[in-house]
Amino acid sequence: ISGSLKVLVTDDGEDLSVAFRRWRAAWSYTRPGKLKVEWRDGHTSEIEVVLADADPLPSSFVGLHVMEDQIKWENFSGVWTGGVRTYTGNVTVTVPGDLPPKMRLRWDGRSTGFTLPSGLSVSLAQGPGTRWIDLERGMQGQVTDANGNVDSGTWSSLRGVLVGETLQPHTKNSFQLGAGLTLEVVPRYLSPWR
């Protein structure tokens, strides 16, 4: 996916040249940033983007208080995401979107268990603290800590047991989540206009 943004950079609170440099420095050709659309109803759409191209830098800011700029961006996943939806306990989840959502469990580390819509039941022994269990198919229940580091010891207890779960959008799916577990679901869209 690619697109462009046309913006007005203003000198509110700081010199225009400083504001413009700060705006441009926020973009990278190699390090993805988040482009976020906030709707009037409070919902959001996000996409990770990198800089594809930008207008040439102005030769002078003298006497200017506002300047138009255009940024061209690219995304390599082809997916917009909605805001995180959280669930606890025994719940029926219906997720909007065009594609299966991203799902993970936030686990506070206590001994507990859960049952997925596929019927798979998993018991968790007491763990080392708050962890996230990736429920996406192919991630095989990868366990990470709050900093995103893989917890290989805890993950090894799930290997061969948990291969992941795929939910289809707009279908009802029942989860049984034990104490200390929170399901985090992120809808995926092909367009931000959903």
What would you call each of these model-derived segments?
Residues Y29-V79:
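Short beta-strand and beta-hairpin "edge-sheet" elements
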Residues S2, T30-P32, L64-E68, V84-T86, ...:
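A general secondary-structure signal for short beta-strands and their flanking turns/coil
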Residues A25, F61-G63, V95:
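Generic marker of residues within folded, mature protein domains
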Residues V9, V37-H43, L116-S118, L177-A179:
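Short acidic, glycine-rich loop/turn motifs
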Residues T81-R194:
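Intrinsically disordered, low-complexity segments enriched in serine, threonine, and glycine
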Residues I1-E14, L64-V79, N173:
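Oligomerization/assembly interface segments of phage tail-like spikes and tubes
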Residues G13-D15, H43, V79-T81, G113:
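Residue-level signal for secondary-structure boundary sites
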Residues S2-K34:
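Compositionally biased, low-complexity regions
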